[in-house]
């Protein structure tokens, strides 16, 4: 098989022009505007659903107006001003956003499939509630604007997040207890807060009149909805921050990796897998899986790009708790992936993590995967986040050494970390010593 990671991807944009007022319909007219894009830029105004907010969207809205009907299901973001109808006002509104000279509400779909807005453009300082905000900052090139964070954020490992210990401490943040956090945030001078934002905090800040925008997006696919993926979140966040080009660099990498993995998904006899999330009790296993609504936890989202299928049916909560004996007997996937959480810092010695992997692999001794040596382990903090696609070639090479090139996997992950993170690694050999980032194979099978 071709092991090339990179392919050229072409996007053709079809545009047209016009101008009238239309309401939503369920029309699916073959002669109407053509949906041309990826559908992952979840910003209102992105009428043609590609990865850009630009003049082609203006033309698409004009074309919809000329057609006289708006298929809201097919073109949800044609409603640039988010008022429920598509009119010539949306054309003017989008032009104002593109001009970027006057602060204008830019609406987007955030985590939980909820619509929020930011005042665009916003070039002020940024506060973060969780590490997702720090991740976004590094990918998009706005890390130097992050000056404040929760108490938790100030304690993150400074290898991955340089200067985290020097952030202004905004205190503890909980979705049900955010009063002190909100007060500290309002005093911080930050005009943006990124990470997980409880809807109640979002509403409270808006009601306060304080000009603080909230970007409720994640660098991990911990969402029950299929459209809020790692890629769509980074792209959407990039456009909200005026850093679309940086976001599209990540998208280009993700596209190349997804094409690479998809090429190996062609066979019908796919291996089955199950993800055992941070197993610590030999008697009971928590298994991450897909949500019934299409989304997935970050580890499952990433691993699903490999030529495997989830052995466990989708669940309303994205996770199922199961007796270990029952798991080994009745689920019994071809491959078990142990998803470690909090087991290691980025630069923990790999041999220390391997001991943890081998200890927890013992829980599955009666499974076919254990007997055949097909238990592997990942660190959720890398595989379950935006770094996952960068590291996934390594996991593929462990599972199928004849199909995936291990050296290429190391090189790809190393290049990824150099481009999209602030980790200081001088060589691939340095990366191999990052026990909290890399992947593992059990070493205890008979």
Regions found by a protein language model. Name each.
Residues 63-70, 96-100, 141-142, 186-190, ...:
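Sec-exported extracytoplasmic/periplasmic mature domains
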Residues 124, 128-187, 192-198, 311:
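A short, structured surface patch at a secondary-structure boundary
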Residues 154, 287-319:
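Alpha-helical, coiled-coil/dimerization segments enriched in small aliphatic residues
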Residues 1-29:
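Secretory targeting signatures
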Residues 18-106:
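Cellulosome-associated attachment modules in secreted, modular CAZymes
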Residues 111-113, 167-181, 315-325:
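Short helix-initiation/N-cap motifs at beta->coil->alpha
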Residues 103-107, 201-285, 374-444:
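Extracytoplasmic substrate-binding proteins
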Residues 125-129, 138, 145-150, 191-196, ...:
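Structural recognition of the beta-strand scaffold that forms the well-ordered cores
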């Amino acid at each position: 098989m071709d092991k090339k990671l990179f392919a050229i991807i072409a996007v053709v944009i079809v545009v047209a022009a016009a101008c009238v007022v239309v309401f939503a319909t369920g029309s699916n007219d073959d002669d109407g505007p053509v949906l041309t894009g990826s559908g992952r830029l979840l910003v209102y105004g992105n009428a043609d659903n590609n990865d850009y907010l630009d003049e082609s969207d203006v033309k698409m809205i004009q074309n919809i107006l000329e057609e006289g009907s708006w298929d809201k299901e097919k073109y949800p973001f044609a409603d640039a001003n988010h008022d429920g109808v598509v009119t010539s006002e949306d054309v003017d509104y989008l032009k104002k956003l593109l001009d970027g000279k006057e602060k204008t509400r830019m609406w987007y779909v955030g985590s939980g499939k909820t619509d929020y807005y930011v005042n665009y453009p916003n070039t002020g300082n940024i506060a973060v509630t969780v590490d997702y905000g720090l991740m976004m900052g590094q990918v998009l090139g706005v890390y130097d604007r992050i000056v404040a964070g929760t108490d938790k954020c100030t304690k993150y490992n400074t290898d991955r997040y340089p200067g985290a210990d020097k952030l202004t401490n905004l205190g503890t943040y909980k979705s049900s207890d955010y009063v002190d956090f909100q007060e500290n945030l309002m005093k911080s001078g930050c005009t943006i807060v990124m990470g997980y934002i409880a809807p109640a905090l979002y509403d409270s800040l808006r009601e306060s009149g304080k000009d603080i925008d909230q970007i409720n997006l994640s660098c991990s696919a911990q969402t029950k909805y299929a459209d809020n993926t790692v890629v769509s979140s980074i792209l959407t966040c990039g456009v909200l921050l005026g850093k679309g080009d940086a976001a599209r660099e990540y998208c280009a990498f993700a596209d190349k990796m997804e094409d690479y993995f998809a090429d190996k998904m062609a066979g019908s006899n796919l291996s089955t897998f199950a993800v055992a999330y941070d197993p610590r009790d030999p008697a009971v296993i928590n298994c991450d899986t897909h949500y019934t609504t299409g989304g997935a936890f970050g580890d499952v989202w990433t691993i699903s790009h490999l030529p495997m299928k989830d052995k466990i049916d989708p669940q309303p909560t994205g996770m199922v708790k199961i007796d270990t004996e029952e798991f080994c007997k009745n689920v019994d996937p071809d491959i078990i992936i142990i998803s470690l959480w909090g087991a290691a810092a980025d630069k923990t010695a790999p041999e220390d993590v391997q001991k943890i992997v081998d200890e927890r692999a013992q829980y599955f001794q009666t499974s076919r995967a254990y007997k055949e040596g097909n238990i592997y382990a990942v660190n959720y903090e890398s595989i379950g986040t935006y770094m996952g696609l960068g590291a996934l070639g390594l996991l593929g090479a462990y599972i199928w050494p004849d199909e995936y090139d291990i050296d290429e996997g190391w090189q790809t992950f190393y290049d990824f970390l150099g481009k999209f993170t602030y980790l200081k690694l001088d060589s691939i050999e340095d990366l191999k010593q990052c026990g909290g980032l890399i992947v593992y194979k059990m070493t205890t099978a008979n």
